[in-house]
Amino acid sequence: MRKPFLFILFLVAMSVSMQAQRLERDLYSVAFYNVENLFDTIHDVNKDDAEFLPGGRYDWGTRKYTSKLKRLAQVLSELSRTEVPQGPAFIGLAEVENSRVLDDLVKQPGMEQYRYIQYEGPDKRGIDCALLYDPSQYEITASKLVLSEPFEGDTTHLTRGFLIVDGRLAN
């Protein structure tokens, strides 16, 4: 009597364990973060980025830039880790200057698993939206930048567009 009971108990435990693993694998995290003027220290031609250059209004130098990258990486790499150990499948970002800052961000400790999508838009300051994604959790199938329609009274017509990304979650 004892052996069949232990065998049934073993089967129940295995079933619960397999179900928990399946649920854990099906749990994904998504995040959004406004990185608030993530500018590098290099002037972009045809962009109004002078405030974020050495000697500019914010005296934006290598030390400030590097410090901001480290702080952002620390925050982003810890998002949702208690609930989803692998971290977010993707993270939307606002106010990114260009691909150089994203290259630098994904090289920071804790961010190495991420790749990114970003398009240069017409914003006069040069800030754009971007998507960081972990290719082990999310496969990009298509992406594009959709420019916003000018609104009544808009005289510049130069603003960030909408980043549209299609993809599949990993199974």
Which ranges hold each PLM region?
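Bacterial Sec-dependent N-terminal signal peptides
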Residues: M1-L23
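Basic side chains
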Residues: R2-K3, K68, R160
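Generic low-complexity, intrinsically disordered sequence content enriched
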Residues: F10-S15, A73-L76, V106, S136
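A generic structural signal for solvent-exposed, polar alpha-helical segments
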Residues: A13-V16, F39, V45, E139
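N-terminal, active-site-proximal structural segment of metallo-dependent hydrolase catalytic domains
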Residues: A20-I127
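Structured beta-strand-rich core segments of catalytic domains in phosphoester-bond hydrolases
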Residues: V96-N171
